[in-house]
Amino acid sequence: KFDPHKPYVLVTTGGGGDGATLIDWVLRAYEHYKRLDIQALLVLGPFMQSKLQSGFMSRVSRVDAVHAITFDSHMEALFEHASRVVAMGGYNTFCEVLSFDKPCVIVPRTVPRLEQFIRAKRAEELGLSSMLLDDDERRPEDMAHAIEGLEHQAPPSAIHIPGLLDGLSTINAVVDRWASEP
């Protein structure tokens, strides 16, 4: 049974439509490496095919440290209580990682677009998160190592980047300037 009061790694695929690879990789890490003792909460996403969801739920039922849900309308609470995050790196998820200040490993999608890869690469260069690239081998030990590494990874707030989360105040300043023009 999942205990939200104990440390956990939140694994999120965003909508889930293309998240099966990430979920499978994390599950294989837990299936092969019992030393991964931090519990994992997998959020499959509402757009993941139901056949894939069923298969993952079946596998999850055999791994004590892993729990899965399809969707939660209060993802913010899951982020808030998570101690670590593994995600694909979509824009909204990345903003939540920054806002909730969570150590994160991003496993970006590279097909059909490089958007997540570009975001993950730059975030890693800045020290905001780490990145694990899908090399098509998806070795369980690579994912296990990435999850374990999050324990020693600083949260994004440890890196001071002026203006990083100042979008709202910047927009307000621009609107105020426009509003004061004759």
Question: What is each residue range found by the language model?
Answer:
Residues 74-118:
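A donor-sugar binding/catalytic signature common to diverse glycosyltransferases
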Residues 2-84, 136:
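Donor-nucleotide binding loops and adjacent catalytic segments primarily
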Residues 142-182:
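C-terminal amphipathic helix plus adjacent low-complexity
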Residues 53-61, 121-125, 148:
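Class I S-adenosyl-L-methionine
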Residues 69, 107, 132-133:
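Hydrophobic residues at beta-strand termini and immediately following loops
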